[in-house]
From Swiss-Prot:
Residues passing through the membrane, by range: none
Entry GO CC: chloroplast; large ribosomal subunit
Name this polypeptide is given: Large ribosomal subunit protein uL22c
Pfam families on file: Ribosomal_L22
Lineage: Eukaryota, Viridiplantae, Chlorophyta, core chlorophytes, Chlorophyceae
Description of the deletion phenotype: Cells are erythromycin and tylosin resistant. Ery2 mutants (formerly called ery-M2) are cold-sensitive for growth at 15 degrees Celsius. Resistance and cold sensitivity are recessive to the wild-type allele. At least one mutant (ery2-4 formerly ery-M2d) has fewer chloroplast ribosomes than the wild-type.
Subcellular location: Plastid, Chloroplast
Transit peptide: 1-43
Superkingdom of this protein's organism: Eukaryota
Amino acid sequence: MALRACSSSLVARSAARSVQPFRPAAVRPARIAPVARKTATVVCSAATDAPAAPVAEAVVGEVKSGVAHLKFQRGSADKIRRVLDVIRGRSYEEALVLCEYMPYRACEKIIKCLMSAAANAKHNKGALKTKLVVSECFADEGPVLKRARPRAQGRANLIMKPTFHMTIRVEERAQ
């Protein structure tokens, strides 16, 4: 008898929980993220399927930018992102100074990639390093190296050694 009372209360509790109804993609609000293209058209559809209206059809001049990739580096992508979030949107020189004085090991790899991106912008597009801004930077997870550590009685523990891929883009500041 006690078992029946217990099971019926579980059913009542689970029925009382609020269950979110499934909403199809057309009804769900989309992330609003305008993307500027060469013709300066804003690409966005917020909660509707209507196409976005062009903002201005003026052709934007070529932006002097440089990109650098660092791939298959040992370390956690989360620890890299912690520093990348700080330097995003800052000037090249300010980002270098910040990374030099931060107490994280990830900063060494970020400085290497940042200097490479600035050198690419200067060499390929003729950009001035004093006018560069970190416009985009992100880190993705790479493959995980799996190793075994011997334990007692013939067992083994799995050791995970994560890797990451990092991309930094610098652009010349518009005056």
